[in-house]
């Protein structure tokens, strides 16, 4: 039986071979060109093909076998059709949080711009374009093969299970890119509306002080219904391993449900690609994985992906803002949704307002509402980031950590760190994610009001003066996209010792960064301040490393998450990290249940006690400390419980011989 899989433009027909335990069905095209999907233990899909289009075709087909209902529902999300098919008042997943379906649809239809996405992706490689075509064709092929009645119970016979389009797939990527910024603040975008004459606007001094105090106590969460992602990763170089090769331990903490759930696969293009690992969302590439030469994992970066801009409004018209003395009219977009199927339902609609900085938002919990004189706009650095596919395609064929670093040079990594090791015994930590090019000096110079500075210190919300064009993000010609910090000024550690990261600032990834003379506290995103050997690390501000025993004092921060440390009184580097905002697991507490369960850490998190001490070193040498699974420490005690021995834990060793 011949299965024709590719679009008509493809010269050769495509066949799919599916091998299951105890059952093998082979389909071959007349041309002999095939995609093979082999299922081994635990249902892991091993997919091989002659090119990237075939690989993506097989990935989409196999992923749909396991996740077709989830995929079909996610396509409703990115199309803005949830309320039409699933009910207006029911909720759905948007990025890391949940919102009513109507709100999701309104936001999605407003934000998604298919023409802009096509333009942004116009420069991607031929292999990347072929991969996108193959993925769409593979998913649609599965729908044809299964038929409406051959789907799982959750979506069998449902009218909302429809073929995927290229625009749909581009939208799913965009949704993944913005979930650390615009997506997390979708509720704030929807909440923005011009003030009504005669109603109270503004925030009194007392109210503002109360709001800031509340934010400082509980940490600002733009989406209270949302979740957070976090992971742990350790990479050991030849100085820290018995055989002199690289060793990687990846401990990712992503959800068990939804589009961020990992799906494992093994991809092979003979002579070109042989990579295994996991992907999240609708993606034809391995995002965390290994080949015979190098292995990598990811953690969540502390960098910011957006800034807010405080707008000075025309006192006679709250939809007119002023930049350098010149009035500008906000763009007005009204989105109308089709009525859902409920009896008597009426179409929902919402009007959005957009500035040159981005859409207007309202964050009343932070004291950032829309008044007669002031409004706030959001600029997200990951909007129209279509570079990620090429990044992970290149990572899959890297032969060492240096090539892995080069693969990330196009700045497609949206909001994560990379920890890696290679067969030659090299280890790497890199934050080459997308971060706005805004220095600490600029944060200070462009702070529009004391309120903005207070929000930065208390909640990590960067607010710039939108009434001055000079407060636009710096444009460095070395950046992949205007307004980003270029890779040459982002933090990278290349070492034969070890690195680790647990969603913390880069300087915590190896004690040498904390003790090797990098004690200035004017670190900015725009200027290198820290050195690791001959390599520079830049970016994330931190608390001063040389303080008396006890809690270090705060220093001026840039677009990073705030960190703090306690230091041993005898001068040893016993450093505890206080997670003031991100509540994902930190350091060696990876053994604890993740936030989907009510383990000890989750109970502490819900009680507001989110500080998890972590010892980086204690005079015995960092490699020895890590080799003993973090058992050495300044106090010798763990506040939550004894630390287990990780020596028998599952580890990913770099493959290969010679």
Residue ranges and their predicted role:
Residues 273-275, 279-346, 393-395, 450-462:
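Compact, glycine/acidic-enriched structural inserts
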Residues 384-389, 394, 398-412, 419-422, ...:
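Ordered core of a single globular domain
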Residues 1-12:
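Bacterial N-terminal signal peptides that target proteins for export
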Residues 374, 411-527, 546, 577:
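Hydrophobic alpha-helical segments
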Residues 56-57, 244-245, 256-260, 265-266, ...:
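Short helix/loop capping segments that flank catalytic or ligand/cofactor-binding pockets
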Residues 27-259, 270-272, 276-281, 285, ...:
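Substrate-recognition/specificity elements adjacent to catalytic centers across diverse enzyme folds
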Residues 12-20:
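Hydrophobic helical h-region of N-terminal Sec-dependent signal peptides
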């Amino acid at each position: 039986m011949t299965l024709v899989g590719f679009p008509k433009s493809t010269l050769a027909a495509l066949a799919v071979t599916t091998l299951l335990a105890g059952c093998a069905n082979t389909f071959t095209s007349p041309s002999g060109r095939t995609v093979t999907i082999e299922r081994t233990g635990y249902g892991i899909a091993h997919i091989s093909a002659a090119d990237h289009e075939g690989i993506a075709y097989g990935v989409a087909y196999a992923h749909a076998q396991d996740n077709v209902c989830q995929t079909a529902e996610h396509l409703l999300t990115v199309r803005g059709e949830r309320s039409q098919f699933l009910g207006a008042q029911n909720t759905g997943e948007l990025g890391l949080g949940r919102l009513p379906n109507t709100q999701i649809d309104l936001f999605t239809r407003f934000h998604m711009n298919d023409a802009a996405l096509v333009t942004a992706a116009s420069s991607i490689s031929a292999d990347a374009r072929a991969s996108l075509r193959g993925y769409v064709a593979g998913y649609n092929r599965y729908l044809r093969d299964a038929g409406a009645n051959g789907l799982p119970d959750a979506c069998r016979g449902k009218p909302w299970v429809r073929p995927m389009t290229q625009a749909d797939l581009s939208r799913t990527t965009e949704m993944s890119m913005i979930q650390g910024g615009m997506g997390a603040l979708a509720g704030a975008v929807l909440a923005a509306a011009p003030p009504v004459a005669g109603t109270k606007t503004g925030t009194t001094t007392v109210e503002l002080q109360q709001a800031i105090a509340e934010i400082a106590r509980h940490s600002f969460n733009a989406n209270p219904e949302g979740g957070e992602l976090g992971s742990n990763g350790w990479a050991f170089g030849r100085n820290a391993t018995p055989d002199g090769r690289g060793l990687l331990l990846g401990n990712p903490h992503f959800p068990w449900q939804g589009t961020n759930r990992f799906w494992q696969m093994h991809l092979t293009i003979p002579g070109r690609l042989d990579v295994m690992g996991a992907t999240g969302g609708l993606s034809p590439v391995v995002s965390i994985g290994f080949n015979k030469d190098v292995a990598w994992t990811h953690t969540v970066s502390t960098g910011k992906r957006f800034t807010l801009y405080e707008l000075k409004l025309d006192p006679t018209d709250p939809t007119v803002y002023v930049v350098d003395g010149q009035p500008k009219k906000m763009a007005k977009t009204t989105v109308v949704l089709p009525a859902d199927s409920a009896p008597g339902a009426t179409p929902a609609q919402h009007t959005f307002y957009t500035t040159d900085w981005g859409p207007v938002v309202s964050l009343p919990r932070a004291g950032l509402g829309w008044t007669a004189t002031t409004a706030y706009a959001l600029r997200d650095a990951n909007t129209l980031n279509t570079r990620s596919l090429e990044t992970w395609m290149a990572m899959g064929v890297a032969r060492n950590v240096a090539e892995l670093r080069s693969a990330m040079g196009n700045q497609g990594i949206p909001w994560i760190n990379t920890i890696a090791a290679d067969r030659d015994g090299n280890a790497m930590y890199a934050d080459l994610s997308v971060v706005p090019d805004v220095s600490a000096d600029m944060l200070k110079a462009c702070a529009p009001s004391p309120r903005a500075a207070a929000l930065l210190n208390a909640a990590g919300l960067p607010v710039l003066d939108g009434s001055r064009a000079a407060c636009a993000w710096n444009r460095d010609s070395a950046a992949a996209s205007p307004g980003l910090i270029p890779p040459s000024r982002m933090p990278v550690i290349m070492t034969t010792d070890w690195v680790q990261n647990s969603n913390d600032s880069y300087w915590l990834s190896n004690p040498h960064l904390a003790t090797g003379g990098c004690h200035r506290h004017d670190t900015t995103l725009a200027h290198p301040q820290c050195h690791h050997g001959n390599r520079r690390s830049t970016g994330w501000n931190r608390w001063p490393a040389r303080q008396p025993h006890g809690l270090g004092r705060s220093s001026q921060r840039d677009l990073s998450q705030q960190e703090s440390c306690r230091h041993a009184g005898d001068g040893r580097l016993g450093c505890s990290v206080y997670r003031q905002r991100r509540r994902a697991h930190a350091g060696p507490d990876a053994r604890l249940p993740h936030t989907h369960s009510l383990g000890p850490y989750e109970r502490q998190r819900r009680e507001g006690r989110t500080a998890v001490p972590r010892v980086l070193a204690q005079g015995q040498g960092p490699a020895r400390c890590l080799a003993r699974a973090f058992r050495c420490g300044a106090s010798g005690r763990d506040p939550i419980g004894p630390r287990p021995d990780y020596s028998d834990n599952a580890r990913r060793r770099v493959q290969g011989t010679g």
